[in-house]
Amino acid sequence: MQPLRLNSQGIQTQVIELIKPVTARRPPACKAFPACGSCHYQHWQETEVSVWKQTQVKAFLKRANVWPVQMRPLRTVPLNNRRRATFHLKRFADGIVAGFNEREGQQIVTPESCVVLHPDLSALLEKLRNFAAREFPIGSSVDAQVNGLDQGLCV
């Protein structure tokens, strides 16, 4: 590894030589990974993500002096099932940019499709894009928080 620069998560590095791949890694399902900031852990096996999340929760509870006697393993969300997202839309003179903020930045990444989102949320992004193209003045932008509830979408 070669250090490149400091960022909010530590030191950004570049791989110089891969000696042995880590078994916890998998190819990311999304073509926009890692530029898209929506899915940070797609390159991990689901069991590894679950263990990491559980470690984080236990550490938080310990700092709060609340230590569970027993804790069930945390579940991860399978592909096409995420029911919460923040969509970013911006109107330019030549059209709309709609999608997710890039990782570590403010540029909007517009993936062709999102393999993580529930199909209802993916369909809503296209509807929001069409709405913004008709209704937004040039230069305006909006962040749309969306939650998929059992009764429908809450925007």
Show the residue positions of the predicted features.
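Accessory RNA-recognition modules of RNA-modification enzymes
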Residues: 1-155
